[in-house]
Amino acid sequence: MPSTKVAALSAVLALASTVAGHGFVQNIVIDGKSYSGYLVNQFPYESNPPAVIGWATTATDLGFVAPSEYTNADIICHKNATPGALSAPVAAGGTVELQWTTWPDSHHGPVISYLANCNGNCSTVDKTKLNFVKIDQGGLIDDTTPPGTWASDKLIAANNSWTVTIPSTIAPGNYVLRHEIIALHSAGNADGAQNYPQCINLEITGSGTAAPSGTAGEKLYTSTDPGILVNIYQSFGAANGAVATGSATAVATTAAASATATPTTLVTSVAPASSTSATAVVTTVAPAVTDVVTVTDVVTVTTVITTTVL
């Protein structure tokens, strides 16, 4: 085989290997029932793909959204995303297990989840009208040996799955759950972070009243956020705001050095304290509130603590 063909074949195989390493949410489990995600490696090639709760995308290369695209609608639910035709019921306070395809262990980074109220039918919602509030975040777990142990590593260890608890205080309605991994292995370079957003439709039931206004998807991040432009082999800053009070992941502040970020996340009214505790990535401290307030982040993460969930 001529050397030029060998070189071309090597390049193709290298690209295929890289692409194959990236993932997407293929299945969702709620109250013991399984729901298919949007199978981007299968459905786009079918003449009549099934209706699912996952949002369709054109990211057939299993690629990512780069920081240079953060003001583009693709950051909301991935490339050219369109709403899922179905919604899955879940009670406020219930859990949603998101099962990814195999995630590469080299792609270290946080795992973050948001909710946005569709204020109507999620199957026809305009994604640019959605406003997201963060309900769950995992980041740096152990920085003893750089690049450290990350939420992505925890996801891999859990058979490539991540479980999100729906806030017990959230008002009932139709919501989009935006769930993503941000790979930071190349984030020391400008435009090097890699966002892999995934969206599913939920019908949340319950008697909660919390209705935080949230943040538009195109305003969740900037390309120079401390948690986006960062060398994980040296330091880390949390990507975007705090987790809403009442969520499964609570947050607190402890940092040897810190920087502030633009407030983007809202905190809902607090629920009565429970005895449940969860491991929290150190990102911010939210004051006790009785209404919706804005929180300014402390973004440098240096430790992991255990705190009581409200």
From Swiss-Prot:
GO terms (BP aspect): cellulose catabolic process
Keyword field: Carbohydrate metabolism, Cellulose degradation, Copper, Disulfide bond, Glycoprotein, Metal-binding, Monooxygenase, Oxidoreductase, Polysaccharide degradation, Secreted, Signal
Annotated function: Lytic polysaccharide monooxygenase (LPMO) that depolymerizes crystalline and amorphous polysaccharides via the oxidation of scissile alpha- or beta-(1-4)-glycosidic bonds, yielding C1, C4 as well as C6 oxidation products. Catalysis by LPMOs requires the reduction of the active-site copper from Cu(II) to Cu(I) by a reducing agent and H(2)O(2) or O(2) as a cosubstrate. Active on cellulose, but not on xylan, starch, or chitin.
InterPro entries in alphabetical order: AA9 (IPR049892), AA9_LPMO (IPR005103)
Designated gene of the protein: AA9A
Biotechnology: Lignocellulose is the most abundant polymeric composite on Earth and is a recalcitrant but promising renewable substrate for industrial biotechnology applications. Together with cellobiose dehydrogenases (CDHs) an enzymatic system capable of oxidative cellulose cleavage is formed, which increases the efficiency of cellulases and put LPMOs at focus of biofuel research.
Coiled-coil ranges (or none): none
Position of the signal peptide: 1-21
Top-rank taxon: Eukaryota
Catalytic activity field: [(1->4)-beta-D-glucosyl]n+m + reduced acceptor + O2 = 4-dehydro-beta-D-glucosyl-[(1->4)-beta-D-glucosyl]n-1 + [(1->4)-beta-D-glucosyl]m + acceptor + H2O
Reported temperature dependence: Optimum temperature is 40 to 45 degrees Celsius.
Documented EC number(s): 1.14.99.56
Source organism of this protein record: Talaromyces pinophilus
Official protein name in the record: AA9 family lytic polysaccharide monooxygenase A
Location(s) in or outside the cell: Secreted
Residues the entry annotates as binding Cu(2+): H22, H107, Y196
GO molecular function, one term: monooxygenase activity
GO CC annotation, single: extracellular region
Names of required cofactors: Cu(2+)
Disulfide cysteine pairs (residue numbers): C77-C199, C118-C122
Binding site residues for O2: H185
Cofactor binding mode and count: Binds 1 copper ion per subunit.
